Every structure is written in structure tokens, then in C-alpha cells.
């Protein structure tokens, strides 16, 4: 007896199951690698790292001041530009995460700052003295 021909969705289901079983078997190893890399890369700098950080920053400053960027190849320039843009974009993403809103800080419509309230009181006091 011949095996029945599988339909499109049955093939997709079988493929998805095979991928899931493979990924499920690989997960512990990959999670351990991710955890080790995250622990190393996301840790704040140690006291011993500061001299190297200062030296690297001095190199960047001298590179900019001496115009060393003019001698870069197109490829190097594009790579440095891409890295700089990535840092800037992640800064803005962090800002959005920090304020928990995409477009700006949520300020209530009836919010009045303390300095504005103080100014209004002063103006009302002056108006009362004039009358």
C-alpha cells in the first residue's frame, strides 16, 4: 500500500515539527553560550579595564584631530559609519525604553510646572496691588 500524498499544510506541519525538535535539542547548549557571552560583554568595566579604555579614547581623539579619517578606504569609512550609527540608534532605543513611550514624555494635559505657578502668583499679587 502506498503512503498517502501529503498536502501543503501537512508538509509545513511536519517541517515545523522537525525544526522544533532540532532547536529544542540545541537550546541548552546555545543558552549556555548566550549566558556566558552576555555575562562577559554586558558587564560594566572593571578597574583594570580603565587604562585600556582611556588609551583607546585617546587614539580616537588623535585620529579625529589629526584628520586620520581622510586616509580611510571607502570600506573602512562605511564600517565605522555603520558602527557609529548603530551606537546612536541604540541610544535612542534606550531612551524610548526608559521613558516607556516612543514619541516623547507623557505629560498630563492639566500639568502646570511649579515655576509657572509661582509666576502666576506673583502676577496676581502685582495685579492686586495695582487695583
From Swiss-Prot:
InterPro entries, A to Z: ATP_synth_F0_gsu_mt (IPR006808)
Coiled-coil parts of chain: none
GO molecular function: proton transmembrane transporter activity
Superkingdom per UniProt: Eukaryota
Keyword Ion transport appears in the UniProt entry: yes
One GO term (biological process): proton motive force-driven ATP synthesis
Compartment(s): Mitochondrion membrane
Entry GO terms, CC: mitochondrial membrane; mitochondrion; non-motile cilium; proton-transporting ATP synthase complex
A Pfam family of this chain: ATP-synt_G
Keyword Ion transport set for record: yes
Keywords in alphabetical order: ATP synthesis, CF(0), Hydrogen ion transport, Ion transport, Membrane, Mitochondrion, Transport
Role this protein plays: Mitochondrial membrane ATP synthase (F(1)F(0) ATP synthase or Complex V) produces ATP from ADP in the presence of a proton gradient across the membrane which is generated by electron transport complexes of the respiratory chain. F-type ATPases consist of two structural domains, F(1) - containing the extramembraneous catalytic core, and F(0) - containing the membrane proton channel, linked together by a central stalk and a peripheral stalk. During catalysis, ATP synthesis in the catalytic domain of F(1) is coupled via a rotary mechanism of the central stalk subunits to proton translocation.
PANTHER family per UniProt: ATP SYNTHASE SUBUNIT
Subunit field text: Subunit of the F-type ATPase which has 2 components, CF(1) - the catalytic core - and CF(0) - the membrane proton channel.
Family label: Belongs to the ATPase g subunit family.
Protein name (database record): Probable ATP synthase subunit g 2, mitochondrial
Species this protein is from: Caenorhabditis elegans
